[in-house]
């Protein structure tokens, strides 16, 4: 069978067709200034001196954008490498052609591991948050807080091992030299918890968002067993004019710690013998119309970003990967807001 020769115009025509069909990655590329991340990424990732020769490293922006692709589509490292080779939209997003070298799974893993160990997740998030603030997209007129479970790979431990881990210790058997490989595969930071008769294992993504724009303005990562309200006050600052949250955040302790000019718009909770009055129910309904906007964020992550899960082990990687999820959500929301403003 005669080999098919692909010419320059064939490739251009295919890209043109992708644009006509509404390539979401092209839309994201059109509004993002990826160069704002270059200096920090280079500082953390530059390991070797190539001035004396040798193959130059893959550009840090290409590596970063490969991580963005991996998270948007919730792919494994191997699948990310495969899809970049297979899909023209991925190649165009990265700025590479059919004849260019494609980033491999090991390189993406090493890049993310380096960023995680350098605690770069929060740094990158804050850098983009500064862009959102400078463009006036975050109004601070209303702040919403909530948390969602982030499922992690389940561990098959004995009851005694789980008890030891829950006490903040590592089982002695795992610490033996011959079990070093086993310990590397054990997550001693994730926790089991139960909510509404559903069992969860992993971590929690505690999120603060701007009520007007639905942009995430802060976040924290904890194990799944920590109560939602434990990180609420850490999120608040003097710019916040009103705090919206569900009834899990209600209580005198949070109300007493609110900033002076921050209005308490947390939904009220009924108790045994003290049910909510009709007025309280009506007020809760009004508050919920604003508060529910944060659920749209988690819905986007579950749907458009193909799930809120992680495949890594340990709190360090969890902080990075969950932070990357929040950052990429902001990228996508930013693209939507920019496109909406030009309509």
Model-derived regions, located:
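Charge-patterned, long linear interaction tracts outside catalytic cores
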Residues: 316-343
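Charged, often Cys/His-bearing segments associated with DNA-binding zinc-finger transcription factors
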Residues: 1-43, 337-343
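Short, well-ordered loop/turn and helix-capping segments at boundaries between secondary-structure elements
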Residues: 86, 90, 117, 241, ...
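Helix-centered, glycine/charged polyanion-binding patches within enzymatic domains
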Residues: 241-242, 247-316, 320
């Amino acid at each position: 069978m005669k080999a098919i020769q692909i010419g320059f115009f064939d490739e251009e025509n295919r890209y043109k067709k992708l644009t006509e069909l509404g390539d979401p990655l092209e839309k994201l590329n059109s509004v993002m200034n990826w160069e704002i991340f270059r200096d920090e990424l280079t500082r953390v990732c530059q390991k070797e001196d190539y001035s004396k020769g040798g193959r130059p490293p893959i550009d840090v922006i290409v590596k970063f954008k490969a991580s963005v692709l991996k998270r948007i589509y919730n792919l494994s490292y191997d699948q990310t490498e495969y899809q970049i080779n297979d899909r023209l939209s991925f190649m165009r997003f990265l700025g590479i052609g059919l004849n260019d070298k494609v980033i491999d799974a090991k390189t993406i893993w090493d890049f993310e591991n380096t960023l995680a160990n350098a605690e770069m997740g929060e740094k990158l998030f804050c850098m983009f948050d500064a862009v959102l603030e400078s463009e006036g997209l975050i109004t601070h007129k209303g702040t919403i807080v909530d948390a969602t479970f982030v499922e992690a790979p389940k561990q098959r431990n004995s009851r005694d091992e789980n008890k030891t881990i829950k006490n903040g210790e590592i089982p002695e058997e795992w610490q033996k030299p011959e079990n070093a490989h086993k310990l590397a595969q054990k997550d001693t930071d994730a926790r089991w918890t139960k909510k509404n008769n559903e069992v969860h294992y992993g971590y929690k993504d505690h999120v603060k968002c701007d009520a007007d724009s639905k942009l995430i303005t802060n976040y924290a990562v904890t194990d799944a067993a920590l109560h939602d309200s434990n990180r609420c006050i850490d999120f608040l600052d003097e710019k916040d004019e009103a705090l919206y949250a569900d009834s899990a955040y209600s209580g005198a302790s949070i109300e007493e710690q609110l900033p002076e000019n921050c209005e308490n718009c947390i939904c009220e909770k009924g108790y045994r013998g003290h049910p909510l009055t009709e007025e309280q129910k009506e007020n809760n309904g009004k508050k919920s119309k604003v508060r529910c906007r944060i659920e749209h964020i988690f819905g986007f992550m579950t749907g458009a970003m193909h799930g809120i899960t992680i495949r890594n082990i340990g709190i360090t990687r969890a902080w990075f990967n969950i932070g990357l999820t929040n950052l990429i959500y902001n990228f996508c929301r930013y693209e939507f807001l920019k496109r909406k403003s030009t309509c």
